[in-house]
A protein has these predicted regions:
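Terminal, low-structured helical/coil segments at or just beyond the last alpha-helical repeat
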Residues: 268-351
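Residue-level recognition of tetratricopeptide repeat
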Residues: 48, 82, 116-117, 168, ...
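TPR/TPR-like (Sel1-like) alpha-helical repeat modules
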Residues: 132-141, 245, 249-276, 284-287, ...
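Structural signature of tandem alpha-helical TPR/SEL1-like repeats
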Residues: 52-65, 86-99, 122-134, 175-198, ...
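Helix-start (N-cap) detector for alpha-helical repeat units in TPR-like alpha-solenoids
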Residues: 33, 39-41, 74-75, 108-109, ...
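Canonical tetratricopeptide repeat
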Residues: 45, 79, 113, 158, ...
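Position-specific recognition of the canonical hydrophobic site in helix A of tetratricopeptide repeat
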Residues: 44, 51, 78, 85, ...
């Protein structure tokens, strides 16, 4: 069936090209342009087939041939950019995405991909932020026909993703600043928190959004908000160990060993068997907190320890990977629900 369809498409393009060549005698310039367009679309079709077969080199050759003839084909530019990313040719990928945007200004996928590789791979955070802002500011035609078509949700989701990626870009820019640029770092982290907050307004139960909001407030020294969002992240996806671990570290710093032990124990269980180095470090931290707790035999009120919007003077180790354990049977549901409980949540609630 696939071969028959491919043959029909080839015949269609050949017949159409012959017809357009014939028409070129009436309007030569227009006719030549249309011939190039049709032949370009044919090469793009060949590229699409190769792309689906995962034959990337043939796809690249076909797309390049097609785009020489029909450079306005924005989807071909997008696919070509994606292939360059797979080959880790990020500069060529960026150029392909830029060409896609030239062909279609409000092409959200191309802008999003361009922003991601510009920030994550090329280190141009300002350019990435500009792309995300363009997505946020874009005025797209929204249409909702029940049970037929609805692009309102996708447009809303894209804005949430753009805000989230913008937050990451601000955070990364802050991370790469020299240590003596404390004021600038704080300002950038503040901008990251605003961007993550905008994403959270759209998508409240996303683990990554809540976790990065928590982490940003943690770095800013706003422990109350950090605790609130760590708990939200844990409730959204309890089997990721990072939120448990970072919350445990923060509670240790706030002299709340009982709650710190609870979170660090969960982090240790979730990281065991997957990240041996991380697991050992978590167990070491857990052991030290447990020992301190046993020696003191008490924990002080956290409400006297939390300071809002004051940077933390002590550097704290942070693990930033996407490890998780997934429950697979009914017996583990209870375990998941136990991990979902953020025992220190009430400590961060505003009176």
């Amino acid at each position: 069936m696939g071969k028959l369809l491919s043959l029909i498409m080839k015949i269609f393009f050949i017949v159409l090209a012959i017809f357009l060549i014939y028409c070129a005698t009436i309007g030569r310039e227009f006719g030549i342009k249309q011939v190039h367009k049709i032949m370009g679309m044919y090469y793009v079709h060949v590229g699409d087939e190769a792309y689906q077969r995962n034959d990337m080199q043939e796809a690249v050759d076909a797309y390049q041939n097609g785009l020489k003839l029909f450079p306005e084909h924005y989807e071909a530019w997008l696919n070509l950019g994606n292939i360059y990313v797979a080959y880790e040719d990020y500069y060529s990928a960026a150029q392909a995405y830029q060409n896609a945007i030239l062909a279609k200004e409000n092409y959200t996928l191309a802008r999003m991909n361009l922003g991601i590789i510009t920030a994550e791979k090329l280190g141009d955070f300002d350019a990435a932020i500009a792309e995300y802002q363009s997505i946020i500011d874009s005025k797209q035609f929204l249409l909702s026909i029940p049970f037929v078509f609805d692009n309102k949700k996708s447009a809303k989701d894209n804005k949430a993703i753009a805000y989230y990626n913008m937050g990451r870009a601000y955070s990364q820019k802050a991370f790469y600043l020299p240590q003596n640029k404390k004021k600038e770092k704080k300002e950038l982290l503040g901008q990251a928190a605003v961007a993550y907050g905008k994403a959270h307004e759209i998508t409240k139960n996303d683990y990554d959004i809540n976790y990065n909001l928590a982490l940003t407030y943690h770095l800013l020294g706003d422990y109350r908000k950090a605790g609130q969002y760590y708990c939200k992240a844990i409730e959204a996806s309890p089997m990721h160990y990072e939120a448990h671990y970072n919350l445990g570290l923060m509670l240790k710093h706030l002299n709340q060993p009982k709650y710190a032990i609870d979170e660090l124990e969960k982090a240790a269980v979730l990281s065991s068997g997957k990240y041996s180095t991380h697991s050992k470090y978590i167990f070491d931290v857990l052991s030290s907190v447990t020992l301190e707790f046993q020696q003191k035999g008490e924990d002080k009120s956290i409400r006297d320890k939390i300071k809002i919007n004051e940077p933390d003077t002590q550097e704290q180790p942070l693990i930033l990977v996407n490890g998780k354990v997934t429950a697979t049977d009914e017996a583990e549901v209870a375990i998941v629900e136990n991990f979902r409980k953020c025992m220190s949540k009430e400590l961060f609630e505003v009176n």
